[in-house]
Curated annotation (Swiss-Prot):
Designated name of the protein: ATP synthase epsilon chain
Gene Ontology terms: cellular component: plasma membrane; proton-transporting ATP synthase complex
Keyword Transport: yes
UniProt xrefs under HAMAP family: ATP_synth_epsil_bac
Similarity-based family: Belongs to the ATPase epsilon chain family.
Chief location of this protein within or outside the cell: membrane
Keyword terms, alphabetized: ATP synthesis, Cell membrane, CF(1), Hydrogen ion transport, Ion transport, Membrane, Transport
Membrane topology annotation: Peripheral membrane protein
Subunit-level organization: F-type ATPases have 2 components, CF(1) - the catalytic core - and CF(0) - the membrane proton channel. CF(1) has five subunits: alpha(3), beta(3), gamma(1), delta(1), epsilon(1). CF(0) has three main subunits: a, b and c.
GO MF assignments: ATP binding; proton-transporting ATP synthase activity, rotational mechanism
Organism: Lactococcus lactis subsp. cremoris (strain SK11)
Amino acid sequence: MSENVMTLQVITPAGVVYDHHANYITARTTNGEIGILPNMISTIAGLEIDELKVRRPDDETHVDYIAVNGGIIEIKDSLVTIVADSAERNRDIDVSRAERAKIRAEKALEVAKAEKKSDEIKRVEVALHRALNRLNVSSHN
C-alpha cells in the first residue's frame, strides 16, 4: 500500500458499514475535531455523534459522508478502525425515517421538559442529536 493511503473500517454490531482506502479523514472526537492522515501517531479516542468525512484516493474531489453515533476510533499505522453503536453512509440513510425520529424526539423532549425529568431529557436529547446528524449527513447526497 502507498505511504499516502490508509484503510478505514467502520464497524457496528450489525457488521461492517465501510471498508475503503482513504487519504484524509475528518472525525469529531470527545476532545474536538481531528484530521487524520496516513501514518499518523497511534491514537485511541472517543467519538461524538457527528459526521465522518472520508476523502478517497481514487477521486480526491469526492467525499464520502458517514453518520456515526458515537463510539471509539483507533488509529494505528495505516489502519483507522471505528467501532460504533450505529453508523450509516449518506446514501443508505432513510430520510423519511430520520425525519420521523426527529419529530418523535422533539415531542418527547417537550414532554420531558414539562415533567422536569432530567434523565429523560438527556436521553431524548441524544435521540434528537442522532436524528439531526442522520438528516445532516443525508443532505450530502
